[in-house]
C-alpha cells in the first residue's frame, strides 16, 4: 500500500460515523458547500434512477458508509437493495436507522427534499418506510478483494451503486482499476454501474481526523471505467467544491456505465 495512505485499520479504529454525518449531511437552509454538493448529488441520482433507464430488481450499494441519501431515488426503481461497507461502525449506524432505534441519524430534511424532486408522490415518512422495506441485507464489503462481499451467495445484480467510496478505498490507480474489475464480478451482463465521487481530492476531513483520497481527474476515471470493461452511457462533472477546511477536491462526477452483454 502506498506510504501514508489511510489504512483499513485506521478506518476501523478512527472513522466516526456520527461526526461524518453531522459534517456532510446536516442538510438544511444553511448555505454551505456541503449542502450544495448534497443537493447536486440528490438531483443527479433522481435523474439517473427516476428519469433514466436504470431500473431492475436487485441493486447492491458498495461502500454505503453510514448514509442512505444515495438510495432514496433508487428505491423507486429497484425492489431489492443490499447495502455494504468495510467498517463495522458504519454498518451499525445503518442498522440503527433501519430499526428506528433511539439516536439514529435524522434524515428527514434530505428525504423531504427528495420527495419534492419526485413530485411529492409520497410524504417523507412513507419514503423512509419504502426504503427500509427495500433493504434486504446489510453486508461487510472490501472492494480491494476479488470477492468484494466475501463468500456471500447472491444473484448477479442489475445495478451496482458506489458513492464517495472508491477514491477513499484505493491507494493508487492500479488498485482503483482492480477494484472496478472486482465489482464487475457482482454485476449481471447488461447491468448498470452508477458511480459518484470527488475529483482531484487527496484528502477529506472528519473533525480533526484526516483521511486519504486518491486524486483522479475525470479523464482518468473515464479511462479506468472503460478499461475495466464498462461502456459509459452518462458522465457528468459537478463543478462544486467542498469547504476548503473539509477537502481539496476540484468538483465531483457522476457516471452511468454498463457491463457488456444482454441482461435477462
Curated annotation (Swiss-Prot):
Inducing or repressing factors: Up-regulated in white adipose tissue and liver in response to high-fat diet.
Binding site for nicotinamide: 197, 213
Localization in the cell: Cytoplasm
UniProt KW Cytoplasm keyword: yes
EC number: 2.1.1.1
This protein's UniProt keywords: Citrullination, Cytoplasm, Methyltransferase, S-adenosyl-L-methionine, Transferase
Binding-site residues for S-adenosyl-L-methionine, renumbered to this chain: 20, 25, 63, 69, 85, 87, 90, 142-143, 163
Activity regulation note: Inhibited by 6-methoxynicotinamide (JBSNF-000088).
UniProt GO molecular function: nicotinamide N-methyltransferase activity
GO cellular component term, pick one: cytosol
Pathway entry: Cofactor metabolism; Amino-acid degradation
Reaction catalysis annotation: nicotinamide + S-adenosyl-L-methionine = 1-methylnicotinamide + S-adenosyl-L-homocysteine
PANTHER family: NICOTINAMIDE N-METHYLTRANSFERASE, NNMT/PNMT/TEMT FAMILY MEMBER
Function: Catalyzes the N-methylation of nicotinamide using the universal methyl donor S-adenosyl-L-methionine to form N1-methylnicotinamide and S-adenosyl-L-homocysteine, a predominant nicotinamide/vitamin B3 clearance pathway. Plays a central role in regulating cellular methylation potential, by consuming S-adenosyl-L-methionine and limiting its availability for other methyltransferases. Actively mediates genome-wide epigenetic and transcriptional changes through hypomethylation of repressive chromatin marks, such as H3K27me3.
Membership in a protein family: Belongs to the class I-like SAM-binding methyltransferase superfamily. NNMT/PNMT/TEMT family.
Name this protein carries in UniProt: Nicotinamide N-methyltransferase
Organism (species): Mus musculus (Mouse)
Source organism phylogeny: Eukaryota, Metazoa, Chordata, Craniata, Vertebrata
Amino acid at each position: 500500500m502506498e506510504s501514508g495512505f489511510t489504512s483499513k485499520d485506521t478506518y476501523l479504529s478512527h472513522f466516526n460515523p456520527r461526526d461524518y454525518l453531522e459534517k456532510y449531511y446536516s442538510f438544511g437552509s444553511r448555505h454551505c458547500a456541503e449542502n450544495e454538493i448534497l443537493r447536486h448529488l440528490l438531483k443527479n441520482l433522481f435523474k439517473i434512477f427516476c428519469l433514466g433507464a436504470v431500473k431492475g430488481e436487485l441493486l447492491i450499494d458498495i461502500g454505503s458508509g453510514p448514509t442512505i441519501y444515495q438510495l432514496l431515488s433508487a428505491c423507486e426503481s429497484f425492489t431489492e437493495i443490499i447495502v455494504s461497507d468495510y467498517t463495522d461502525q458504519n454498518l451499525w449506524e445503518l442498522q440503527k436507522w433501519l430499526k428506528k432505534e433511539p439516536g439514529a441519524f435524522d434524515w428527514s430534511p434530505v428525504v423531504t427534499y427528495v420527495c419534492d424532486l419526485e413530485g411529492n408522490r409520497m410524504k417523507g415518512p412513507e419514503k423512509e418506510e419504502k426504503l427500509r422495506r427495500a433493504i434486504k441485507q446489510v453486508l461487510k464489503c472490501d472492494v480491494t478483494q476479488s470477492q468484494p462481499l466475501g463468500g456471500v451467495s447472491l444473484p448477479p445484480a442489475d445495478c451496482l451503486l458506489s458513492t464517495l467510496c472508491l477514491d477513499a478505498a484505493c491507494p493508487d490507480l492500479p488498485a482503483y482499476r482492480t477494484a472496478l474489475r472486482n465489482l464487475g464480478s457482482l454485476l449481471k451482463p447488461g447491468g448498470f454501474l452508477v458511480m459518484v465521487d470527488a475529483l482531484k481530492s487527496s484528502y477529506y476531513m472528519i473533525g480533526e481526523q484526516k483521511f486519504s483520497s486518491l486524486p483522479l481527474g475525470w479523464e482518468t476515471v473515464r479511462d479506468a471505467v472503460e478499461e475495466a470493461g464498462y461502456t459509459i452511457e452518462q458522465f457528468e462533472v459537478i463543478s462544486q467544491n467542498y469547504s476548503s477546511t473539509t477537502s481539496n477536491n476540484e468538483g465531483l462526477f457522476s457516471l452511468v456505465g454498463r457491463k457488456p452483454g444482454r441482461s435477462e
